[in-house]
Protein backbone atom coordinates (compact mmCIF):
# COMPACT_ATOMS: atom_id res chain seq x y z
CA UNK A 1 0.00 0.00 0.00
CA UNK A 2 1.32 3.44 -0.86
CA UNK A 3 2.42 5.77 1.91
CA UNK A 4 0.10 8.68 2.72
CA UNK A 5 0.99 12.20 1.74
CA UNK A 6 3.08 14.10 4.25
CA UNK A 7 3.03 17.74 5.25
CA UNK A 8 5.12 19.86 7.59
CA UNK A 9 1.95 21.23 9.20
CA UNK A 10 -1.63 20.41 8.43
CA UNK A 11 -3.47 21.80 11.42
CA UNK A 12 -4.87 18.50 12.68
CA UNK A 13 -3.78 17.84 16.27
CA UNK A 14 -2.88 14.19 15.57
CA UNK A 15 -0.69 15.15 12.61
CA UNK A 16 -2.67 12.93 10.25
CA UNK A 17 -2.86 13.44 6.53
CA UNK A 18 -5.29 11.84 4.11
CA UNK A 19 -4.26 8.33 3.01
CA UNK A 20 -5.85 7.85 -0.42
CA UNK A 21 -4.71 4.25 -0.89
CA UNK A 22 -5.93 3.16 2.52
CA UNK A 23 -9.30 4.85 1.99
CA UNK A 24 -9.74 3.12 -1.39
CA UNK A 25 -8.93 -0.26 0.17
CA UNK A 26 -11.47 0.37 2.93
CA UNK A 27 -14.22 1.19 0.42
CA UNK A 28 -13.43 -1.99 -1.53
CA UNK A 29 -13.77 -4.01 1.68
CA UNK A 30 -17.07 -2.32 2.48
CA UNK A 31 -18.43 -3.20 -0.96
CA UNK A 32 -17.42 -6.82 -0.40
CA UNK A 33 -19.01 -6.73 3.07
CA UNK A 34 -22.42 -5.66 1.74
CA UNK A 35 -22.34 -8.38 -0.91
CA UNK A 36 -21.17 -6.36 -3.92
CA UNK A 37 -18.38 -6.97 -6.41
CA UNK A 38 -16.11 -3.90 -6.43
CA UNK A 39 -14.60 -5.01 -9.75
CA UNK A 40 -17.85 -5.08 -11.69
CA UNK A 41 -18.69 -2.45 -14.29
CA UNK A 42 -20.06 0.60 -12.51
CA UNK A 43 -18.15 -0.04 -9.29
CA UNK A 44 -14.59 -0.44 -10.56
CA UNK A 45 -13.76 3.24 -10.04
CA UNK A 46 -16.00 3.72 -7.01
CA UNK A 47 -13.34 3.20 -4.31
CA UNK A 48 -11.16 5.94 -5.82
CA UNK A 49 -14.13 8.27 -6.27
CA UNK A 50 -15.38 7.74 -2.72
CA UNK A 51 -11.89 8.25 -1.29
CA UNK A 52 -11.54 11.56 -3.15
CA UNK A 53 -15.00 12.59 -1.97
CA UNK A 54 -14.12 11.85 1.65
CA UNK A 55 -10.92 13.82 1.31
CA UNK A 56 -13.06 16.84 0.38
CA UNK A 57 -15.82 16.12 2.89
CA UNK A 58 -13.30 15.85 5.74
CA UNK A 59 -11.01 18.67 4.59
CA UNK A 60 -11.49 20.41 7.92
CA UNK A 61 -9.30 17.77 9.58
CA UNK A 62 -6.25 18.99 7.70
CA UNK A 63 -6.46 22.75 8.22
CA UNK A 64 -6.33 24.60 11.52
CA UNK A 65 -9.61 26.55 11.63
CA UNK A 66 -8.09 29.23 13.86
CA UNK A 67 -5.81 30.35 11.01
CA UNK A 68 -8.89 31.56 9.14
CA UNK A 69 -9.24 34.31 11.75
CA UNK A 70 -5.60 35.44 11.65
CA UNK A 71 -6.56 38.46 9.53
CA UNK A 72 -8.51 40.97 11.60
CA UNK A 73 -9.27 44.68 11.36
CA UNK A 74 -9.37 47.26 14.14
CA UNK A 75 -12.49 49.11 13.04
CA UNK A 76 -13.49 50.51 16.45
CA UNK A 77 -16.85 48.83 15.86
CA UNK A 78 -18.70 48.06 19.08
CA UNK A 79 -22.08 46.91 17.79
CA UNK A 80 -23.42 43.54 16.69
CA UNK A 81 -21.97 41.76 13.66
CA UNK A 82 -24.35 39.04 12.46
CA UNK A 83 -23.94 36.63 9.55
CA UNK A 84 -27.13 34.64 8.97
CA UNK A 85 -28.09 31.52 7.08
CA UNK A 86 -24.59 30.26 6.23
CA UNK A 87 -25.17 26.97 4.35
CA UNK A 88 -23.24 24.09 5.89
CA UNK A 89 -22.77 20.38 5.31
CA UNK A 90 -21.27 18.09 7.90
CA UNK A 91 -21.04 14.36 8.62
CA UNK A 92 -22.55 12.60 11.62
CA UNK A 93 -19.70 10.76 13.33
CA UNK A 94 -22.06 8.00 14.51
CA UNK A 95 -23.27 6.84 11.08
CA UNK A 96 -21.03 8.74 8.61
CA UNK A 97 -23.97 10.23 6.76
CA UNK A 98 -24.66 13.90 6.16
CA UNK A 99 -26.35 16.46 8.29
CA UNK A 100 -26.91 19.80 6.65
CA UNK A 101 -28.53 23.13 7.27
CA UNK A 102 -27.56 26.67 8.16
CA UNK A 103 -25.46 28.44 10.77
CA UNK A 104 -26.13 31.90 12.19
CA UNK A 105 -23.11 33.58 13.78
CA UNK A 106 -23.15 36.83 15.74
CA UNK A 107 -20.62 38.65 17.88
CA UNK A 108 -20.04 42.00 19.55
CA UNK A 109 -16.41 43.14 19.13
CA UNK A 110 -14.30 43.65 22.22
CA UNK A 111 -12.73 46.84 23.52
CA UNK A 112 -10.39 47.20 20.53
CA UNK A 113 -13.23 46.91 18.02
CA UNK A 114 -11.50 43.99 16.29
CA UNK A 115 -13.54 42.37 13.51
CA UNK A 116 -12.86 39.78 10.84
CA UNK A 117 -14.01 39.53 7.24
CA UNK A 118 -17.53 38.20 6.75
CA UNK A 119 -16.24 35.49 4.41
CA UNK A 120 -13.88 34.34 7.17
CA UNK A 121 -16.85 33.50 9.36
CA UNK A 122 -18.35 31.35 6.61
CA UNK A 123 -14.98 29.68 6.10
CA UNK A 124 -14.72 28.98 9.83
CA UNK A 125 -18.10 27.26 9.76
CA UNK A 126 -16.98 25.15 6.79
CA UNK A 127 -13.75 23.97 8.39
CA UNK A 128 -15.43 22.82 11.58
CA UNK A 129 -18.27 21.24 9.60
CA UNK A 130 -15.95 19.31 7.28
CA UNK A 131 -15.00 16.59 9.74
CA UNK A 132 -16.81 13.80 11.59
CA UNK A 133 -19.02 15.78 13.95
CA UNK A 134 -21.94 16.04 16.28
CA UNK A 135 -24.01 19.18 15.94
CA UNK A 136 -23.59 20.25 19.55
CA UNK A 137 -19.80 20.18 19.34
CA UNK A 138 -19.76 21.89 15.94
CA UNK A 139 -21.79 24.78 17.35
CA UNK A 140 -19.52 25.17 20.39
CA UNK A 141 -16.30 24.95 18.35
CA UNK A 142 -17.36 27.83 16.10
CA UNK A 143 -18.20 30.00 19.10
CA UNK A 144 -15.02 29.16 21.00
CA UNK A 145 -12.80 29.90 17.99
CA UNK A 146 -14.30 33.39 17.74
CA UNK A 147 -13.71 33.93 21.46
CA UNK A 148 -10.06 32.85 21.18
CA UNK A 149 -9.17 34.87 18.11
CA UNK A 150 -11.31 38.02 18.33
CA UNK A 151 -11.72 38.44 22.11
CA UNK A 152 -15.26 39.77 21.62
CA UNK A 153 -17.62 40.95 24.32
CA UNK A 154 -20.14 38.34 23.27
CA UNK A 155 -20.65 35.50 20.79
CA UNK A 156 -23.73 33.53 19.83
CA UNK A 157 -23.91 30.70 17.30
CA UNK A 158 -27.09 28.89 16.26
CA UNK A 159 -27.08 25.87 13.94
CA UNK A 160 -30.24 24.41 12.38
CA UNK A 161 -29.80 21.11 10.56
CA UNK A 162 -31.52 18.03 9.19
CA UNK A 163 -29.76 14.75 9.97
CA UNK A 164 -29.98 12.08 7.29
CA UNK A 165 -29.23 9.41 9.90
CA UNK A 166 -32.66 10.30 11.29
CA UNK A 167 -34.33 10.81 7.90
CA UNK A 168 -33.23 7.74 5.91
CA UNK A 169 -32.79 5.12 8.65
CA UNK A 170 -33.91 4.42 12.21
CA UNK A 171 -37.03 6.47 12.99
CA UNK A 172 -37.14 7.77 9.38
CA UNK A 173 -38.44 11.26 10.00
CA UNK A 174 -37.43 13.34 6.96
CA UNK A 175 -37.84 17.06 7.46
CA UNK A 176 -37.22 16.98 11.21
CA UNK A 177 -34.64 19.59 12.17
CA UNK A 178 -32.38 20.03 15.17
CA UNK A 179 -31.40 23.44 16.58
CA UNK A 180 -28.35 23.96 18.79
CA UNK A 181 -26.85 27.11 20.25
CA UNK A 182 -23.61 28.20 21.87
CA UNK A 183 -23.65 31.45 23.85
CA UNK A 184 -20.60 33.22 25.26
CA UNK A 185 -19.83 36.43 27.13
CA UNK A 186 -22.38 39.25 27.12
CA UNK A 187 -25.01 37.15 25.36
CA UNK A 188 -24.79 34.57 28.13
CA UNK A 189 -25.05 37.12 30.94
CA UNK A 190 -27.62 39.50 29.44
CA UNK A 191 -30.98 37.94 28.62
CA UNK A 192 -32.19 41.05 26.77
CA UNK A 193 -29.17 41.11 24.44
CA UNK A 194 -29.55 37.40 23.83
CA UNK A 195 -33.25 37.71 23.02
CA UNK A 196 -32.57 40.60 20.63
CA UNK A 197 -29.97 38.74 18.58
CA UNK A 198 -32.00 35.52 18.54
CA UNK A 199 -34.95 37.50 17.18
CA UNK A 200 -32.74 38.91 14.41
CA UNK A 201 -31.43 35.44 13.60
CA UNK A 202 -34.88 33.95 13.25
CA UNK A 203 -36.27 36.69 11.01
CA UNK A 204 -36.50 35.70 7.36
Swiss-Prot record:
The subunit structure is: Homomer.
Q: Which family does it belong to?
A: Belongs to the GTP cyclohydrolase I family.
Q: Does the keyword Cell division apply?
A: no
User: What reaction does this catalyse?
Assistant: GTP + H2O = 7,8-dihydroneopterin 3'-triphosphate + formate + H(+)
Q: Which GO terms describe its biological process?
A: one-carbon metabolic process; tetrahydrobiopterin biosynthetic process; tetrahydrofolate biosynthetic process
Question: GO cellular component terms?
Answer: cytoplasm
Binding, Zn(2+):
92, 95, 165
EC number(s)? 3.5.4.16
The highest taxon in the source lineage is Bacteria
Q: Which UniProt keywords apply?
A: GTP-binding, Hydrolase, Metal-binding, Nucleotide-binding, One-carbon metabolism, Zinc
Q: Which organism is it from?
A: Mycobacteroides abscessus (strain ATCC 19977 / DSM 44196 / CCUG 20993 / CIP 104536 / JCM 13569 / NCTC 13031 / TMC 1543 / L948)
Name this polypeptide is given = GTP cyclohydrolase 1
> GO MF annotations for this entry?
GTP binding; GTP cyclohydrolase I activity; zinc ion binding
